[in-house]
């Protein structure tokens, strides 16, 4: 395929994002031609993806595949807090560091956080958001992850940051959480839930959120008209980078909320263009650190795979084939 041939070194280009953007614009035509001769290959990819469903056991396995590449690897191209989600830019001139801090601030203000709040974070990452919220907004935080690598790093972060004593860190699946919280936040963890588990996820959030509480969900989405087709196949990202991952549908999120919960959407902000800028900075930093990536034991194919992955995602956001949203939910009292 297109991505595989780049990874294998069969072709190269000085502007990979431009090439992938062109491919995205012609995606429907490419898919029609592919259907004529690659049904068996597509079925094999779909079956492989189905084998990576996000059950309790499957979720841990899928998360480990991606995030347990090692913290030293991610330090090479992420900001100092290791935020692995879209930043928030006031202008294209913003640094990655300042844009990630702006994202944390933006989310905290949307949630109206204060010292009176007990916030649940579903998906700790490397602890950057929880550390920021505890230090700057004074709230108590319970945060959970299922990645051992991220858990161990976040523990070290919380032990040294101001307000870290207000943070409780768990190594637990969201389905097993207990208690109730004033606010909930989940930043780009939802892609690891999977469409078949929407009701289970939102039922858990509904149970964990106090009456009159609010929740912010930040997630990557795909065009609504592409969603049904997207679910029926696997793709390059899910095959090589994120097993078990699925982009979200805002429409299906709304249906799940109505079907299974007392939660309702009261605000939505599309920040897809911010993700394109974030990915561009990640990609440039990754390429600048190529020598250090190799020193960690990764080969040339791995380098090209990650270059393609970052360019592929950036192109998708720039063409608005995929996007990123922050959804505010309220729970009826």
Model-derived features: where do they sit?
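Substrate-binding/catalytic lobe of Class I Rossmann-like enzymes that use SAM or dcSAM, i.e.
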Residues: 221-333
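N-terminal auxiliary segments of SAM/dcSAM-dependent transferases
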Residues: 1-78
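Conserved class I S-adenosyl-L-methionine
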Residues: 115-125
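A short acidic, Gly/Pro-enriched loop at the edge of an enzyme's catalytic core
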Residues: 175-185
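Conserved SAM-binding loop of SAM-dependent methyltransferases across substrates and taxa
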Residues: 126-137
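Conserved beta-strand signature within the Rossmann-like core of class I S-adenosyl-L-methionine
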Residues: 212-220
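Conserved SAM-binding loop
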Residues: 154-155
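A short glycine-rich, Lys/Arg-flanked "PGG" loop and its adjoining helix->strand segment in the class I
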Residues: 199-211
